[in-house]
Regions:
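Residue-level detector of intrinsically disordered/flexible regions characterized by low predicted structural confidence
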Residues: 4-5, 189
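Hydrophobic h-region of N-terminal signal peptides that target proteins for export
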Residues: 10-18
């Protein structure tokens, strides 16, 4: 009797796990990111992405994390007949929030001028297309802008090139329109 009860509990638990699909992988675009998705039913998912948005160009160092809640919609029946022989095509749209930092060493010719530090927060959006293969692999292409205020500080290291050794400013993060930009994601579904 205990064995039957154990098997029944295990079967119910496995159905509950299967009903909440997850995917883990990476996104590659303007930067590189770790990506995790957790499904809520068949039409919603929570996406968590964290990584470096700039690929370390010109002595850069950066980090960013974004969480979005996405609504998933299948493509129409006509599209599915032609392009979905074994897999499944979906499009999705979502909103969320994100934050990050960006630091780079400013240089003119061979002289280091100082450090420029940015911290940004904002509202994130996401729109994309995904293909779920008949085996546990997912490919997607999406655009995920992150817009909001950014706070930055210039630190003069040579004491000559800038009138004030520290300059603090606040403005709108226009880089967020392309830094989260169009990305290709590859994820393992489990």
């Amino acid at each position: 009797m205990k064995k039957i009860l154990f098997v029944a509990v295990l079967a119910v638990a496995s159905l509950a796990v299967y009903a909440q699909p997850r995917a883990i992988g990476g996104r590659l675009g303007y930067g590189i990111e770790f990506s995790y998705e957790h499904g809520f039913g068949e039409s919603n998912m929570l996406s968590i992405d964290a990584g470096v948005p700039t690929l370390f160009i010109n002595n850069d160092f950066a980090g960013e994390a974004v969480v979005t809640y996405d609504w998933i919609n299948p493509f129409g029946a006509d599209f599915s007949k032609v392009w979905s022989h074994k897999g499944e095509w979906n499009w999705y749209l979502g909103v969320g929030a994100g934050a990050g930092f960006h630091t780079w060493h400013l240089k003119a010719a061979d002289t280091y001028l100082g450090w420029d530090d940015h911290i940004f927060v904002g509202v994130a959006g996401r729109v994309g297309v995904e293909y779920n293969f008949w085996f546990p692999l997912q490919l997607s292409v999406d655009w995920r802008p992150l817009i909001g205020p950014q706070f930055y500080n210039f630190r003069d290291t040579d004491g000559v090139s800038h009138p004030s050794p520290h300059e603090n400013k606040v403005d709108f993060n226009t880089n967020g329109l392309y830094m989260g930009g169009v990305s290709l994601a590859v994820r393992y579904k489990f």
